[in-house]
């Protein structure tokens, strides 16, 4: 891995990983309507029992490639430290200082406007994801769709260079980030669906965990670069007019372009029988029919989509509001928040890769339930021992962060295992849609608990309550792995 990052012999990198993942056996198919079906013998998996490791790593590197959009642009740096700063409010109001109510109101308005922009993006994803997933499956060109979406994402992130530090440029920044959020989610639909091309039923958990883990590691490396540039004062470059943040955006765009390339070079296009492409209206009619069929024929699959929509929103809330809890409730400085972000991504990345093996041995449902249980417990401790000080957040916050990745990766693995062959992109489109449909839960409970109890720390329980609700719903989901553990590959 280091040879690739440091510009070493890429050929040696891929040759060293050419040893294949081997399918050693099959999971028993079950026809019980109350149990999620197994697809160990489904034609959606590779025809060969061997998947070249270079294809696995090429696929997983796409997670690494796109992570800076989430960690650097959306979460920790561009929006938090630049787009919602006083660079984008009226200079006369900015001159009043942070203690003036007008200044605070202007900053709050920026944050609110950004939130509305991302909310609009979420609504569009909910409307478009399942239909575009159907079209990708019908055309048999998931990789082509992924390539187009990746290039648009690169353009959106690179376009943030033109967001100068003036109020007039604010909505350009919001628009580019919102559009980037849309294409990133749609790209994920096709990326997740391609997982069956680079894994077998015995290795799917490890492959999914590898992707998530590399994603977190990519976030760490990107954040470290930002810290180093700031530490060395950009090596004397002019950083006025927001140039530092604008160059960070360009760097993230180049990062995505470079590290996404291996997937398109080494992972072949899926080989499925093409189906007729239908209109948008017909696509929604098919979606309704699919939901009805899931209710009648595979109700546990529908339960999983519902449960995962709830707890995944809670997991998203953990990272969305974690930095706010650290800064407001525990008094972390800006540098401490970024340091915690690096540590959280490191812990999450390592734990996700390790948890992938437990996914293959014990089944993704058990991994999900254990991870959610630990998250709920850690969140309660953060609130209960808040008075002890920052050490509580460091310990429990990192423990909590270490469980988010395993839960997310196991969820992706579980759905890929039970998706009908040739319709994986459609199912992941539905996965994205249900997730977006529940995306108001964590922010709403966060705000409600703070309003009711009058302190930011109580918002933690609001987010944790969403995770707990999803965990309870997950108890109604049954998979073949629940009948017995799978032997390790």
Language-model region placement:
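Helix-to-loop junctions at the C-terminal end of transmembrane segments
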Residues: 127-141, 351-364
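Glycine-rich segments within core transmembrane alpha-helices of 12-TM secondary carriers
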Residues: 209-230, 434-442
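Juxtamembrane intracellular "pre-TM" segments in multi-pass secondary transporters
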Residues: 39-56, 268-306
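Short amphipathic helix-loop junctions that connect adjacent transmembrane helices
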Residues: 73-109, 320-336
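Intracellular juxtamembrane helix-capping segments at the cytosolic ends
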Residues: 186-199, 406-419
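Structural signature of the two symmetry-related core transmembrane helices
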Residues: 144-159, 366-381
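Multi-pass alpha-helical transporter architecture, strongest
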Residues: 255-266, 461-489
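A membrane-interface helix-boundary motif in multi-pass transporters
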Residues: 107, 230-253, 448-467
């Amino acid at each position: 891995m280091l040879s690739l990052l440091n510009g070493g012999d890429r050929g040696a990198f891929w040759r060293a990983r050419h040893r294949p993942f081997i399918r050693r056996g099959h999971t028993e198919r079950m026809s019980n309507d109350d149990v999620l079906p197994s697809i160990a013998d489904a034609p959606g998996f590779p025809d060969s029992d061997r998947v070249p490791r270079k294809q696995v790593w090429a696929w997983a590197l796409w997670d690494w490639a796109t992570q800076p959009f989430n960690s650097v642009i959306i979460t920790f740096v561009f929006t938090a430290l630049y787009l919602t700063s006083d660079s984008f409010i009226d200079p006369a109001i900015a001159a009043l200082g942070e203690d003036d109510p007008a200044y605070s109101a202007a900053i709050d308005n920026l944050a609110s406007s950004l939130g509305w922009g991302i909310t609009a993006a979420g609504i569009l994803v909910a409307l478009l994801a399942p239909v575009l997933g159907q079209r990708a499956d019908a055309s048999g060109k998931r990789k082509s769709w992924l390539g187009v979406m990746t290039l648009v994402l690169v353009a959106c992130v690179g376009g943030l260079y033109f967001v100068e530090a003036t109020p007039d440029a604010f909505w350009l920044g919001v628009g580019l980030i919102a559009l980037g959020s849309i294409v990133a989610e749609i790209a994920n639909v096709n990326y997740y669906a391609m997982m069956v091309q680079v894994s077998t039923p015995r290795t799917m958990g490890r492959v999914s965990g590898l992707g998530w883990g590399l994603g977190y590691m990519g976030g760490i490396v990107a954040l470290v670069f930002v810290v180093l540039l700031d530490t060395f004062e950009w090596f004397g470059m002019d950083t006025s007019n927001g140039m530092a943040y604008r160059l960070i955006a360009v760097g993230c765009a180049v990062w995505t372009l470079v590290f996404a390339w291996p997937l398109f070079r080494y992972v072949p296009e899926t080989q499925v029988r093409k189906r007729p492409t239908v209109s948008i209206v017909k696509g929604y009619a098919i979606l309704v029919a699919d939901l009805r069929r899931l209710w009648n024929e595979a109700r546990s699959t529908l339960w999983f989509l519902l449960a995962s929509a709830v707890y995944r929103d809670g997991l998203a809330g953990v990272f969305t509001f974690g930095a706010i809890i650290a800064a407001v409730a525990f008094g972390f400085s800006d540098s401490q928040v970024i340091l915690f972000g690096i540590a959280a991504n490191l812990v999450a990345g390592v734990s996700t890769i390790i948890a992938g093996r437990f996914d293959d041995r014990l089944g993704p449902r058990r991994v999900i339930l254990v991870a959610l249980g630990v998250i709920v417990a850690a969140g309660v401790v953060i609130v209960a021992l808040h008075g002890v000080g920052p050490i509580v957040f460091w310990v429990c916050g990192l423990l909590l962060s270490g469980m988010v990745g395993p839960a997310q990766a196991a969820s992706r693995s579980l759905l890929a295992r039970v998706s009908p062959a040739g319709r994986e992109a459609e199912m992941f489109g539905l996965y994205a849609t249900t997730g977006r449909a529940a995306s108001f839960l964590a922010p709403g409970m966060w705000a409600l608990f703070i309003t009711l109890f009058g302190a930011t720390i109580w918002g933690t329980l609001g987010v944790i309550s969403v995770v707990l609700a999803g965990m309870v719903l997950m108890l109604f989901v049954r998979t073949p792995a629940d009948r017995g553990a799978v032997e390790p590959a």
